[in-house]
Amino acid sequence: MSRIGLKVIEVPEKVTVTKNGDDITVKGPKGELTRYFDPRITFEQKDGEIHFSRSSEADKALHGTERANLASMIEGVTDGYVKKLTLVGVGYRAVAQGKKLTLNVGYSHPVVFEAPEGVTVKTPSATSIEIEGISKQVVGQFAAEIRDVRPPEPYKGKGIRYEDEYVRRKEGKTGK
């Protein structure tokens, strides 16, 4: 039994959920999201709640996945998502100019990123980055791409890390 799939989603008053063929559209105060919704999972909308059901036992995993995806879409169009990254290292800097993010993270050249559609990038300080958007998947993917430029290393902890990430540190070699 999919426990996540059986949970009911509360739909806020300012949000509308519509199904058009195999696509589902969620509109809210922050914007609009559309994505493919598997036809093997059905949902019923009544009294500001959404109930999910599946056609067969083979679709258990899909049941919970589609419910979680729709819940994150609803949360995205109402509140949005924010990922915060921190740069740790001497001379590591980030500068956001419009849709471009420029990183100086120890390479001989600056690394430039173009923010995807629907994502805004801010740099409150030279060593912190804030990524905001309505799509949890797009915000998380963009944050992961930035982190992959210079992931935190375990000896000194230098690199780009998520704000709440714990970097497990290792001891260096012991001398004779």
Swiss-Prot record:
One of its GO terms (molecular function) is rRNA binding. GO terms for cellular component: cytosolic large ribosomal subunit. It comes from the Bacteria. Keywords: Ribonucleoprotein, Ribosomal protein, RNA-binding, rRNA-binding. Pfam families: Ribosomal_L6. InterPro entries: Ribosomal_uL6-like, Ribosomal_uL6-like_a/b-dom_sf, Ribosomal_uL6_a/b-dom, Ribosomal_uL6_bac-type, Ribosomal_uL6_CS. GO terms for biological process: cytoplasmic translation. The keyword Transcription regulation does not apply. Coiled coil: none annotated. Part of the 50S ribosomal subunit. NCBIfam families: L6_bact. Belongs to the universal ribosomal protein uL6 family. HAMAP family: Ribosomal_uL6_B. This protein binds to the 23S rRNA, and is important in its secondary structure. It is located near the subunit interface in the base of the L7/L12 stalk, and near the tRNA binding site of the peptidyltransferase center. PANTHER family: 60S/50S RIBOSOMAL PROTEIN L6/L9, LARGE RIBOSOMAL SUBUNIT PROTEIN UL6M. This is Large ribosomal subunit protein uL6. It comes from Lactobacillus gasseri (strain ATCC 33323 / DSM 20243 / BCRC 14619 / CIP 102991 / JCM 1131 / KCTC 3163 / NCIMB 11718 / NCTC 13722 / AM63).
